């Protein structure tokens, strides 16, 4: 049941890791395909590195990925390794986007408080809540997802260090985020609060929004769902299309998710309307920005969710980046990452307080 964890963890790490190098001798490749009577397609496709992305992104996509799975690690070892990476990546982000970072506890929940060096008076009365990625098992984004946005928006970001699977399955992470949101409502008008997340945090952002509605709480001013999905019962076509589950942008043997989500979902029905918001009523949800990319395993999940929001009458925007993999903005040095972060910041600047 740990497969989805590994997928989502590598998702956050792939864009910033140094790829293992293997034999890169040029080989002749051709397209071929076979389609069965039931519509199942077996496709071998030549996918060159596109010229439509930045030179930095081209270099990332051109690197060869090792087939070696590597040794298995315990959840404790996995978390320790990811924590070390997140600390280092956070320092890189702070060099590009200077902020102050402090540990705190809000409503009994540990958080990181990421504060701009200067907050202008008109932005003092607003706050953003980040729900980090990491496959519901590790923290692969509380710094890298929060630092750029705090700097660019000039707004304090509270990154929720929610309880994680497998020790704490659904709805623990939702409950922790709701507790922080309720506490924010004691200080900030709901229209001045935004919630956003990447990957697992994007799933959670939708779930938290559904829970806010179920509880009858006032909706936040805006949400951001970045490389996410809203239905645990349906994987979507891009899961089967992209290799390494669309984490690196390379193609490989397709993987499916299903039982791999079990550590987080636990005994909850995959069609539960909080676990899978698309199974419920989305009317009244706040303005939402969706961001994905064409080699993201959750391209389908993100676009399906965007259309569901539109059908429900929600003010929903979708941005799809060319050729890049899942959660590529975790590499803060890519020009496309800077563009994505700027889009996120502009969206919250536009909608908070309205």
Language model features by range: what are they?
Residues 21-40, 44-60, 64-71, 96-354:
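Alpha/beta-hydrolase superfamily serine-hydrolase fold, recognizing
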Residues 7-16:
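Bacterial N-terminal signal peptides
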Residues 1-4:
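Positively charged n-region of N-terminal signal peptides that target proteins for export
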Residues 76, 80-104:
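A domain-start/cap signature at the N-terminus of enzymes
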